[in-house]
Regions:
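Redox-cofactor binding/interface segments in oxidoreductases and associated redox assembly factors
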Residues: 1, 10-11, 143, 178
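ATP-dependent carboxylate-amine ligase catalytic core
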Residues: 82-163, 170, 175, 184-191, ...
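Extreme N-terminal, non-catalytic leader segments
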Residues: 4-60
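Conserved C-terminal guanine-recognition region of P-loop GTPase G domains, centered on the G4
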Residues: 2, 6, 12, 20-23, ...
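Flexible, glycine/proline-enriched loop segments at strand-loop-helix junctions
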Residues: 10-14, 63-70, 115-118
């Protein structure tokens, strides 16, 4: 139906070859346009890559999440939008691999999910950010970290926080935002999380963000997918206030209506 009205079809996710072929045929039938936003695999000659990490002089803001569905991507866009409205030339390296259609937003590099040695992913990501710094000359770089920072449980390990380990070893952040689930959590949990980030990743959490989804804790120790439920604004504010009171206002904790107060 879109093609009949001269609309573009944007391909931003990997699909089966048969589905892709059908899509191409439809585009040709209606003289439409298929725009492939997916990054192609690159042939990398490791012998030409200096096995070193470069210093990054541009301020780096990292946005990580305790797990999936913590609104990391929306938070990345919101922080970018706020900084741009303040007049800063801001670039975002997204936690997603299909963000090429957004202004000044780079997708997660394809090599991060490729079959190359893990140590080279760290080196290549560092070189990727360095090249961006030199060519784009941004005033701020926002980096979104995909996935979780550690396994949710032994039954639901996710990707074991591999991307977090690789990216935080590739580039040291100047400011780190940790996105949490909208569950009732204790001050002890927050303090222990800060210790984990400090000693496992050599990174300090500067503030926390409460996402819009709560995790169904009864589903994290089963083999079926973890379930989540949306929480309303009133409950989110109450969670935030309860946690701040328990922590005696030592930590900065924000919700989506308070993005401009981050930091």
């Amino acid at each position: 139906e879109f093609l009949k009205h001269n609309k573009q079809i944007l391909l931003s996710r990997h699909i089966q070859k048969e589905t892709y072929d059908d899509l191409v045929q439809l585009v040709n039938t209606y003289s439409g346009e298929l725009v492939n936003l997916l990054q192609s695999e690159q042939c990398i000659n490791f012998n030409t890559i200096p096995a070193k990490l470069y210093d990054i002089y541009t301020p780096i803001i990292d946005i990580a999440g305790i797990g999936e569905k913590t609104d990391k991507f929306l938070l990345q866009l919101a922080v970018k939008d706020y900084l741009e409205r303040q007049g800063y030339h801001t670039i975002l390296v997204s936690s997603r691999d299909n963000s090429l259609y957004l202004d000044n937003v780079y997708s997660l590099p394809v090599f991060m999910n490729g079959g190359i040695p893990p140590e080279y992913k760290i080196i290549l990501y560092n070189h990727f950010i360095k090249k961006m710094e030199e060519e784009e000359k941004p005033e701020v770089i926002i980096i979104g970290i995909p996935g979780e920072i550690m396994p949710i449980s032994k039954v639901q390990p996710g990707h074991f926080g591999i991307h977090a380990f690789q990216i935080l070893n590739a580039v040291n952040p100047d400011f780190l935002i940790m996105s949490l689930y909208g569950n009732e959590i204790s001050g002890k949990y927050v303090k222990e999380l800060k210790q984990i980030m400090k000693y496992k990743f050599v990174a300090n959490i500067d503030c926390f963000y409460l996402g819009n989804y709560a995790q169904d804790v009864f589903t994290v120790n089963r083999s079926r997918p973890i379930e989540y439920f949306l929480i309303n604004e009133k409950d989110k504010i109450q969670l935030r206030d309860n946690l701040k009171n328990e922590l005696e206002y030592e930590e900065k904790i924000y919700i989506d209506t308070e993005i401009e107060m981050l930091g």
